[in-house]
Design a protein with these regions (language model features):
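Pyridoxal 5′-phosphate
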Residues: 1-252
Length: 252
């Protein structure tokens, strides 16, 4: 994210700044501390989508100066269909519930209702019990491995992946390389000049390699850079260097 461009878009009407920590397509890590500082000077709250970073690096919400943080269960090696929102208590106290149902009320009258204490006022009805238990276990699993260990290992994998991809002719990689953005995600988004990314994904699938192809939920980004679609390969702490070699061999 370009800081000067961000400054130009902040106005007195900006109530909330909502942005990604790490791009799921470009892989770049945004300068959140600087953005939060500018937003606070403007009187704006900051909402951080950390789905792409929570399982890959330590995040200190106090240090970043943010007001909200959103996370996703399945991107933390947990179940699908569950996520979470962190915020400061004083902010959550002011926010009205957005779902109605059992357990989130204190008193109900014909014309009005009062709400239960936090966090219950945001947990209407029967919660996703099994998913919540699974998410907690996934978080424990990641913490036992250690986020510092995970980040160090994934940085080495990312550097190796970019090195091997750059050996392939007619490939264009989208996003900053590891030497430019050392905190970038352990992924690579690219396209080959002589084949559509969807066709590439099908060919690799037939060879036992699963990648993502298309817009990656980022159609405006693809239009901005003038590309119809891209291919993306993603790694995490379970990926081995030998698997990168196999992927590159099949890609060639």
């Amino acid at each position: 994210l370009d800081i000067d461009d961000f400054k130009s878009k902040l106005t007195t009407k900006t109530k909330l700044v909502s942005l990604l920590h790490i791009s799921n397509t470009l892989g770049c890590c945004n300068p959140i501390k600087n953005i939060s500082k500018l937003a606070k000077q403007n009187g704006s709250l900051v909402m951080l989508d950390a789905c792409q970073s929570l399982a890959h690096q330590k995040i200190d919400v106090q240090e970043l100066g943010i007001d909200f943080l959103a996370g996703s269960g399945h991107k933390l090696c947990g179940p699908t269909g569950i996520g979470f929102l962190w915020s400061k208590r004083e902010i959550l106290e002011k926010i009205p519930p957005f779902f109605g149902g059992g357990e989130m009320i204190q008193d109900v009258f014909e014309e009005s209702s009062t709400w239960a204490e936090l966090p219950h006022k945001f947990e209407a009805g029967t919660p996703a019990i099994a998913e919540a238990i699974g998410l907690a276990e996934a978080i424990n699993y990641i913490n036992n491995i250690g986020l510092d260990n995970i980040q160090r290992y994934e940085k080495a994998l990312t550097k190796y992946l970019f090195q091997k991809l750059n050996e392939i002719e007619d490939i264009e990689i989208i996003g900053p390389p590891p030497e430019v953005d050392p905190n970038r995600a352990s992924l690579a988004t690219f396209y080959l000049k002589n084949i559509h990314s969807n066709d590439l994904a099908e060919i690799l699938d037939s060879k036992g390699i699963c990648i993502r192809s298309g817009h990656h939920c980022c159609q405006p980004l693809h239009r901005h850079i003038g590309i119809n679609s891209t291919a993306r390969v993603r790694m995490n702490f379970t990926t081995e260097k030998e698997e990168i070699d196999i992927f590159i061999e099949k890609l060639k």
